[in-house]
Amino acid sequence: MSYALLRPFLFNLDPEHAHELTLQLLEKAHKARALGFIYSQQSLPTECMGLQFSNPVGLAAGLDKNGQYIDALAELGFGFIEVGTVTPRPQQGNEKPRLFRIKEADAIINRMGFNNLGVDRLIQNVQRAKYKGNIGINIGKNAVTPVENAADDYIYCLDRVYPHASYITVNISSPNTKNLRDLQSGEALTELLDSIKNRHSQLATEYGFYVPMVLKVAPDLTPEQVDYIANQLIEFDIDGLIATNTTLSRTGVEDLPFGDEAGGLSGRPVGHLSTQIIEQFYERLEGKVPIIGVGGIDSGDKAVRKLNAGATMIQLYSGMIYQGPKLVQQCVEAITSHRDAMML
């Protein structure tokens, strides 16, 4: 069954229930070996952070928080999969309802709150996966951990995921964990990166191999914050930047049903804001740190815009909820055409 036929049924369900049902259906299709007949693997070799990717279109964190559906999702044609956000201990997240569709704007508001089964369960799932491509693991802090002790949670997760990840994302930009975004600014960011990077370097020595570490930031940054973060990325030799997470802005949805719900806004309305932040970071980083662009990508053209803004690769999430899995192929094809045109 095509996603276009399935979508009206799913959109009549509670969003969180629809999310779980979709993943379960995808898993069943994978086990029945049906996905390979529907979706083709897209090849557009890309190098980023010293890693080789089959194509530059990845799955953003949040869709598969516990790494339960890696093999099924990989069959949709992604060049890489990012799982999480995962925390040291399991947590239920915020109270329901906590996920809202804004259909008129192809947008989503969520206040999930890092609901997950804990880092140890995620590692078990990653180990079981047969997928041979790159798997990023997105790590965060538990809600009960004071923000001044956040480094302890990140290091706890870092220690456990290091030998199992292709790259590790330090998520300090979710708006749904109290005070988490404070870690994006000033001394708090410097101290956090200093602690995490020291442990990261120790792990590289202990294991004898290097796993890239990236930082995921919000779109709601001032130019001064962008400058500071860019300097810190270079100072601490961070391997990549994911820009961006969801926004607290309600521009474009303020008068729509559910537009006033608390949480982070994703989907089409965040696209321009995300692209602006990518442009600002690209200018300040001067090519020293690669950028993975995410936010508001719902077409091949939008994917190319992220690359034109300075991104090396992109990630999808909300756009795929509205457009379906074919969006992966559309983005790879658009980027391929863009690259070919650049070489003429």
Swiss-Prot record:
Subcellular location per the Swiss-Prot or TrEMBL entry: Cell membrane
E.C. code: 1.3.5.2
InterPro entries named among the record's database cross-references: Aldolase_TIM, DHO_dehydrogenase, Dihydroorotate_DH_1_2, Dihydroorotate_DH_2, Dihydroorotate_DH_cat, Dihydroorotate_DH_CS
Gene3D superfamilies recorded: Aldolase class I
Primary location group: membrane
Cross-referenced PROSITE patterns: DHODEHASE_1, DHODEHASE_2
Pathway entry: Pyrimidine metabolism; UMP biosynthesis via de novo pathway; orotate from (S)-dihydroorotate (quinone route): step 1/1
Keywords assigned: Cell membrane, Flavoprotein, FMN, Membrane, Oxidoreductase, Pyrimidine biosynthesis
Requisite cofactors: FMN
GO CC terms: cytoplasm; plasma membrane
Reaction equations catalysed: (S)-dihydroorotate + a quinone = orotate + a quinol
Membrane topology, as annotated: Peripheral membrane protein
Active site positions, chain numbering: S174 (nucleophile)
Cofactor binding note of this UniProt entry: Binds 1 FMN per subunit.
Entry binding sites for FMN: A61, G62, L63, D64, K65, T85, N138, N171, K216, T244, G267, G296, Y317, S318
Positions annotated to bind substrate: K65, N110, R111, M112, G113, F114, N171, N176, N245, T246
UniProt record, GO biological process: 'de novo' pyrimidine nucleobase biosynthetic process; 'de novo' UMP biosynthetic process
Keyword Phosphoprotein assigned: no
Superkingdom classification of source: Bacteria
GO molecular function, one term: dihydroorotate dehydrogenase (quinone) activity
Family stated for the protein in its record: Belongs to the dihydroorotate dehydrogenase family. Type 2 subfamily.
Function: Catalyzes the conversion of dihydroorotate to orotate with quinone as electron acceptor.
Subunit description: Monomer.
Protein name: Dihydroorotate dehydrogenase (quinone)
